[in-house]
Amino acid sequence: VRLLVVLGHQNCGAIKQAVKEYDALLHNLTASAEDSLMAADSVADLDERIMNADSIMLRTVGFSIWQAHESELESNEDFERVHIARTIEQLVEHSESIQQALASDRLMIVGARYQLDSGKVEVLSF
């Protein structure tokens, strides 16, 4: 294999569900805080709370939502793009064979997003 395509798609249900769960987690953290300093402390360890969430959707996709918010991105389309990029990062980080193939120029990885309404494929560059 010389080319690996990580293809996401418009209106992704996993992204939508993760956004709901992320927003609920954030709301619960800030609503239970008695003041703004406590709220800031609660949000400061948000990555740990996502990593230890009961929901597999939040554990797997929630980091993409969190990263997008950290970059001040707010749309589902942007969340989808960030999740594609994060998926590529995870593949490279956790696969020694992919790392070796990339290092020796035997493999290219491309991120893309299929637009359901138009049938077009948006190629993403990272």
Map each language-model feature to its residues:
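Conserved functional hotspot residues or short segments at active or partner-binding sites
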Residues: 6
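Histidine-centered divalent metal-coordination motifs
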Residues: 9
